[in-house]
C-alpha cells in the first residue's frame, strides 16, 4: 500500500438565515475516499470556536483533511442551538475533494445555502 497522503483544504461560510440568534456547537463530518473508505469526524465547534451568529451574520473558516486517494467527498452537519436553548441540525451537502491534472486543488465553483 502507498504511504502517499493527499491534503485538502476547504473554506466554509456559515450564515444565519433565520430570524433568531443561533450558535454553532458541534460538527459531524463523513469523509469518503475514492475507494469507499469512510472516516467520521465529530467534535465541538469549528477551528476551536463556537460562533454565535445573529440573524444575517456570517462566520467563515478554513480547515482541511487528509485522504489516501486523490479524490473523495465530504458531507455532514452542524449542531446548533437557538436563543431559547433548542438544538437543531444544519445539514452540509456533499462536496467533492479533488486534485486537477496539474496536481493543484480544484476551486470550489459554487456557494451552497444551508437552512
Features from the language model and the residues they span:
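Short, solvent-exposed loop/turn segments enriched in Ser/Thr/Gly
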Residues: 5-11, 74
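Short, surface-exposed linear segments at secondary-structure transitions and domain or protein termini
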Residues: 33-36, 48-58, 97-107
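Asparagine-centered strand-capping/turn motif at beta-strand->loop junctions
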Residues: 13-19
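Intrinsically disordered, low-complexity Pro/Gly/Ser/Thr-rich segments with frequent PxxP/GP/PP motifs
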Residues: 39-71
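Short acidic, flexible loop segments centered on an aromatic residue
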Residues: 20-39, 80
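Polysaccharide-binding surfaces and accessory modules of carbohydrate-active proteins
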Residues: 22, 39-51, 88-89, 110-114
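Terminal connector regions
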Residues: 66-115
Amino acid at each position: 500500500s502507498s504511504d502517499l497522503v493527499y491534503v485538502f483544504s476547504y473554506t466554509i461560510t456559515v450564515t444565519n438565515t433565520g430570524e433568531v440568534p443561533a450558535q454553532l456547537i458541534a460538527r459531524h463530518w463523513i469523509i469518503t475516499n475514492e475507494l469507499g473508505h469512510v472516516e467520521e469526524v465529530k467534535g465541538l465547534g469549528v477551528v476551536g470556536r463556537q460562533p454565535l451568529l445573529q440573524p444575517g451574520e456570517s462566520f467563515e473558516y478554513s480547515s482541511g483533511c487528509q485522504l489516501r486517494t486523490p479524490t473523495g467527498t465530504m458531507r455532514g452537519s452542524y449542531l446548533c442551538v437557538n436563543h431559547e436553548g433548542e438544538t437543531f441540525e444544519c445539514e452540509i451537502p456533499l462536496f467533492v475533494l479533488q486534485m486537477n491534472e496539474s496536481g493543484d486543488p480544484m476551486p470550489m465553483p459554487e456557494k451552497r445555502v444551508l437552512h
